[in-house]
Amino acid sequence: METVAYADFARLEMRVGKIVEVKRHENADKLYIVQVDVGQKTLQTVTSLVPYYSEEELMGKTVVVLCNLQKAKMRGETSECMLLCAETDDGSESVLLTPERMMPAGVRVV
């Protein structure tokens, strides 16, 4: 396992987020376009959680979000952040990371 200096880890801005909008991507069977409230702003992510969660299960969910990921285009949509998940090696299961207790959107994860 490769080690990472604390200074590099500290550059990651992870925050508690609340999913405020979910819709299926029109041109991709396994993608959702998700709006996440991370406190001071709302970020959009394109995520491949369709096999694991329904839109109803995602809506309103409190999650852990990597906020300062470089923007990327996924099937024509901008993804500005990443929802953090635990995933099995074979990809058969993916579970969103959530705070143990309710925390407001925008709280920093350290």
Swiss-Prot record:
Stretch forming the signal peptide: none
GO molecular function: protein homodimerization activity; tRNA binding
PROSITE patterns: TRBD
Cystine crosslinks: none
Key words of the record: RNA-binding, tRNA-binding
Gene3D superfamilies: Nucleic acid-binding proteins
Pfam families xrefs: tRNA_bind
Domain (tRNA-binding) ranges: 8-110
InterPro entries from the UniProt entry: NA-bd_OB-fold, tRNA-bd_dom, Tyrosine-tRNA_ligase_regulator
Keyword Membrane: no
Presence of keyword RNA-binding: yes
PANTHER family: AMINOACYL TRNA SYNTHASE COMPLEX-INTERACTING MULTIFUNCTIONAL PROTEIN 1, TRNA-AMINOACYLATION COFACTOR ARC1 FAMILY MEMBER
SUBUNIT field: Homodimer.
Protein's name in the database: tRNA-binding protein YgjH
Origin species: Escherichia coli (strain K12)
Name of the gene this protein is made from: ygjH
